[in-house]
């Protein structure tokens, strides 16, 4: 039903494999009066789990420790809803690109893939938008994983907190297909990592580093922003009013790359990441190319 609020105050829950802790397709709620409030700490011991999957306004105050397994997603926003990580610490583990398992702390929206466009419209999944806001802390602790991901015209990602890249080949914010991202906070990395990327902005997406925004990376082959596109699409756009401090051997503040070079720039398969969840579905899918693996609830 609609307008049914979900308040989770259980101290701790554990997810094993292919599970979703809170799922709601109710689109109601506001920042002051959320449809979902989660105060529960969520731990994943396995893989391909979702902490919160929501269409309404959701506030997360719990800590999510999803670092043990691969392919875990902290929160996923659909149907133009908003998920706000108000006070929580969301930690994601690794990704296995070859096995289609991606760790993402916060994700929003879905846009048709090239494979979808080959199908009749009636057989395509529903495109959807979402909004994600981080006011807490995101730790990206596994290779090839992402802090914040937004896809689609109308989808937004806003970081007011801290995104920390704590493993090789990790990315702070990934914006694609006309999504818009704002950084008011900090994107940084742990000591000793390499090949980290602050922001990827792709296919007409836009990234605005606001006046208070800081992208500070000190790592071998660190990259502040990658602007890229698929064939026939437009490059991503960046507006910088804040601070970029990118240091380390082989580091670059900004790089422009055509799609054919994206694998080399980001690591295995990053250009093919999409989150495939039709609006209203009870299962979610993280898709790499043509290979799909679905959580079950």
Provide a role label for each language-model segment:
Residues 1-297:
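Long, low-complexity, polar and repeat-rich extracellular regions
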């Amino acid at each position: 039903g609609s307008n049914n609020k979900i308040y989770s105050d259980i101290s701790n829950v554990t997810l094993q494999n292919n599970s979703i802790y809170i799922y709601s397709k109710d689109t109601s709620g506001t920042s002051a009066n959320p449809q979902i409030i989660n105060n529960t700490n969520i731990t994943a011991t396995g893989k391909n789990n979702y902490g919160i999957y929501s269409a309404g306004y959701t506030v997360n105050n719990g800590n999510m420790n999803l670092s043990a397994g691969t392919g875990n997603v902290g929160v996923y926003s659909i149907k133009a809803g908003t998920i706000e990580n108000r006070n929580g610490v969301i930690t994601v583990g690794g990704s296995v690109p070859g096995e289609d398992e991606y760790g993402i702390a916060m994700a929003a929206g879905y846009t048709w893939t090239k494979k979808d466009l080959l199908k009749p419209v009636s057989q395509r999944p529903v495109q959807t938008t979402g909004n994600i806001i981080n006011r807490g802390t995101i730790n990206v602790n596994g290779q090839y994983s992402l802090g914040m991901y937004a896809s689609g015209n109308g989808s937004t990602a806003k970081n007011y907190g801290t995104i920390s890249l704590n493993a090789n080949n990790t990315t702070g914010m990934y914006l694609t297909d006309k999504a818009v991202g704002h950084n008011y906070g900090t994107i940084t990395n742990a000591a000793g990592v390499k090949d980290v990327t602050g922001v990827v902005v792709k296919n007409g997406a836009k990234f605005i580093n606001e006046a208070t925004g800081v992208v500070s990376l000190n790592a071998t082959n660190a990259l502040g922003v990658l602007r890229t596109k698929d064939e026939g699409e437009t490059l991503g756009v960046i507006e910088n009013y804040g601070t970029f401090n990118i240091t380390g051997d082989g580091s670059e503040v900004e790089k422009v790359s055509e799609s054919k070079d994206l694998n080399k720039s980001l690591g295995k398969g990053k250009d093919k990441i999409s989150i495939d969840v039709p609006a209203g579905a009870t299962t979610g899918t993280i898709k790499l190319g043509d290979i799909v693996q679905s959580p079950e609830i």
